[in-house]
Amino acid sequence: MPEGILTGGLSTSRNLQTILDSNCYTVARLACFCDNAFADAQQEQASLCAADGTLYRDDSGRRWLDPSKPGTLRYITDLAKECAQMGFDEILLDWFLYPISGDQSALELRADKTVVLKDFAQALEKQLPEGTVLSVVLRETPSADNGVTAELLASCFDRVYVMPDADASALPTGYDRATRVVTMAGYAPESGSYLVTQ
């Protein structure tokens, strides 16, 4: 594992296994392409780079993985498979999009963003154990700039979790919002701990 990647200890593993062994429906939320530590550690194999070969940084200084690189697919697939094999019912991909802030002209993209994301999602889904639900977080309104489209969401994911700032009206007509759309809380209640159920 690359340096800078944090892992939990034995008590974390025990606590997690207690939850996974319960009757709770469990969701593993994975940061997909916005990943500073892995981008820093695996620049040539997985990182989104500018045309001059330097790591791409968005306006917030975050580094990104390049979905078109095999190393990125291998890394995310390994994480998702491990979570599914541990017993998680659902894999939720967060940051499943291209960055839209930062110097876009510096990027050297190899192919159409939407095609790359669709190929990535389909390749990942094929590697997951049968019955594992694959979902995605909709952080921004779908656009050609970030590579996310309504068709991509409908064809590649079992559910779409919608962040407060995203426009869910961009989902395809006829999309079953009752079973395939989850509205995410924008903030934790002031009372402290909480559990979201449906």
Model-derived features: positions:
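C-terminal active-site rim and adjoining tail of enzyme catalytic domains
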Residues: P172-Q198
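Aromatic-lined carbohydrate-binding/catalytic grooves of carbohydrate-active enzymes
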Residues: M1-L10
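Aromatic-lined carbohydrate-recognition surfaces of secreted/lumenal glycan-active proteins
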Residues: V27-A31, D35, L92-L93, K113-T149, ...
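An active-site-proximal structural segment forming one wall of the substrate-binding cleft
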Residues: W64-F96, A150-L153
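Active-site-adjacent "subsite" loops/lids of carbohydrate-active enzymes
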Residues: F33-K81
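Active-site-proximal loop/short-helix segments
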Residues: Q42, D89-V115
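Generic structural signal for well-ordered alpha-helices
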Residues: T12-Q17, A80-K81, L117-E125, A150, ...
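Substrate-binding cleft of carbohydrate-active enzyme catalytic domains
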Residues: R14-F33, A80
